[in-house]
């Protein structure tokens, strides 16, 4: 270790590193490598030396790379920033000082105002007490005996020393004590006014606490003034007649009685009813409360709103003759519209789709003799039962059209029933008399079965043979109608408020809701306010059957009415009222009554009934449709026709139907339920068409009700499951049973009838009783697998998953086929 003397030992933390290292290589070679170590230089200022910022600020050594102009600019910016900062600080201090002064000023004002109010209040109170004391002294002086009057003054005189005697200090001592006590109480509170004696504390004896407010003092003064003026007498209670409907809100009841709502609620609570002012109560409860408050009760019903409708009988002296209303009825394609066309000298049939009337047409005809006749042309299709019923209800005479070559048909019988139900006279028009196969006598004979006896067969019903094509018999028909109208002596009062029946209603794109109205009484004028069913409106325009605008319409005149707020139901009654408020009130009442009726019908269904219906509907498949039509009557007729389609397995359900064009909301409903949209004489608007294309909703348009019903019936038939039919193709008798390994029991059979097929179904009969039904596992003839075996041949059969086979059993062989079903 002698060579190591004077050197420091190795360690983890040693002195300076050497700049050389030895690098070793293979075979003992080494190489000396110079190593450079980079270290971060840390500048530590010496104690007492100024900082760099200070040196720069004091004009020390600056960077020579910065020009003098730049350095001057930087210094000016720094000085400007410092000046701006000091200015902002001064402004903040000034603003804070101003805010503090404003707060102090407001606080002082509030204190001064409070002090003034308190002093005014105390002054008023002191004045009141002084007045009370003076009144008490006067009362005591007035009631005291004369000899006691002189001594009564002595205590007052003794209480006031005249010469500044020794009594004064003795009297001031308690005041000083009170002041000291009040000051100590103020200090205990620690408040802003601690130690200060106020007038309020001096008057209240230092008790503190809340005193009477200024408003209370004013109320007391007002009561005293009224008492002095003799106003303390209770006012006489006003007894009112309070109208009570079936239900009334508590606040409305209080308003009608002119009582406080709180008093009414309190009275209800006293009677055991915890009800707020916005809750309704029934009429009996309201009557009890009204009697408790001393008022008189007038019970009214919600239906009383309809009493404004004029239902009085017309004076006989004001009745004038009116045109008869004739309804043309009969079976479809029996020539009703063609006959009316011939009478009107017009062509309506060409405008009807398929030549079939699908609306109630209302027309007015003037005959050659000058008589005015109003005609209603009803549809004859089976779907329009409700239309024919409405036509019979508003008519005076029914003309029953029967084709001479077709005789009495189902809708003819229905028309007879409607006429009898409406108790209106009937005239039989035997049409198509010009046809070669015409047999009018057969028509008369067939009518006898339905208790319609014509004059030719000693009855009272007139019958006329006519031809709509040639015009034969039309004068006789008009003469018969005029004769019947003359016998009826039809009259009406044209000078009263109008009343009519809605024959048809529709939603027109350009005109809005339009109703075809047959005026029955009075005169309907432009500008009249009316209510019809659940709708109301003001007559904006009247259009006659020729399409011309008219100012008014008298009795038995059919017109189109514009100006409704909604589409009414066909068959609704139109009544003219005086004000718009009455019309709106009646319409709202009827709408609410209809809602209540529907809700009651739904509520009447019990849970057991709902469960039973749901269980019954599990096996019923539905075809759902959304339908829009041009008029209300057609929509109702189509819905009735569609609901009749179906059986125990399939039915048609109309999710929604309405009047007017197909809209985007209809498409949305159809898409949500996966149903098609049917348009009858209407089209979809542009947004609806775009929505249908995007959502894949099918829209189908129809103009003939036959095609619509047939297509829906075909679609509903597609929901029916196919009918499975069995065809027996053969029989085989088992002669012997063999045990075959890998197969099981095999029956040696003789085909006695028909043919045995490998793919057919089989039944095993034992003593004519079916004991197994299944399929064949194998069918062999002479050890060969075959597809079929003809009658008279022997074969071997094995059943699938069945082994109980015995000799003399009979095998029945059959095939199944699926047959498509359709609704009839």
Swiss-Prot record:
Chain spans, region G5: 467-469
The entry's keywords: Cytoplasm, GTP-binding, Initiation factor, Nucleotide-binding, Protein biosynthesis
Annotated ranges, domain tr-type G: 321-491
InterPro entries per record: EF-G-like_DII (IPR053905), IF2_assoc_dom_bac (IPR013575), IF2_II (IPR044145), IF2_N (IPR006847), P-loop_NTPase (IPR027417), Small_GTP-bd (IPR005225), T_Tr_GTP-bd_dom (IPR000795), TF_IF2_bacterial-like (IPR000178)
An MF annotation (GO) of this entry: translation initiation factor activity
Region (G1): 330-337
Bias kind Low complexity: ranges: 145-159
Pfam families, per the entry: EF-G_D2 (PF22042), GTP_EFTU (PF00009), IF-2 (PF11987), IF2_assoc (PF08364), IF2_N (PF04760)
Positions of the UniProt region annotated as G2: 355-359
Biased composition (Basic and acidic residues): 59-75, 82-144, 170-186
Compartment(s) of residence: Cytoplasm
Similarity comment: family membership: Belongs to the TRAFAC class translation factor GTPase superfamily. Classic translation factor GTPase family. IF-2 subfamily.
Protein's UniProt name: Translation initiation factor IF-2
Originating organism: Jannaschia sp. (strain CCS1)
Origin organism lineage: Bacteria, Pseudomonadati, Pseudomonadota, Alphaproteobacteria, Rhodobacterales
Gene from which the chain derives: infB
